[in-house]
Amino acid sequence: MSEKFRLRRTMMFANAQKPSLVKDAYIYKPDSLIIDLEDAVSENQKDSARFSLYHILKTVNFRGVERLVRINALDTPHWQEDIRVCVAGGADGIRLAKCESAQDVIQVEKAVEAAEEEFGMEKGKTLLMAALESPGAVLNAVEICKASPRLFGIALSGGDYRRCMHTRPTISGSDIQAARGYMVMAARAT
């Protein structure tokens, strides 16, 4: 149940390897549930996490909560199989970790299109979201936002961004305020 322009005020992350927690996530009434295949899953557990994800997507009644999946970054050997499982399972959308450029979005879009065709899914059904985690990615935000009609949003991954910037979190969030502001302008301008 996904719409490109639906209201997304709250996004709850859940580990794909913990179906017992994922199945009850609707209780908290998030606008979107992001099932994680990336940071929450250790390297040697990626295959079993995808297996779990597929069964979660196929069997759990999310009661109207949007089902997004955070896939592994493009610099890993996992992202293509992540996409195939997301599409085969019927995920509403995919959150691309460590998106650096419009080309990253286009590469993921092509893989999603191929998977939709392979699994007989409606073309264009699977939406995309880009997580920007570096200063370079933030500076590329306008091009990233224009990269695909499937893209419904961009998000700043604050922890990773801070590591790249060699800064520490502040109570006010002033350390990431400029990046957030630029990303809002980029999203609004496109």
Listing of model-derived features with the role each one plays in the protein:
Residues 1-190:
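Expand to "…catalyze enediolate/carbanion chemistry for C-C bond making/breaking, isomerization
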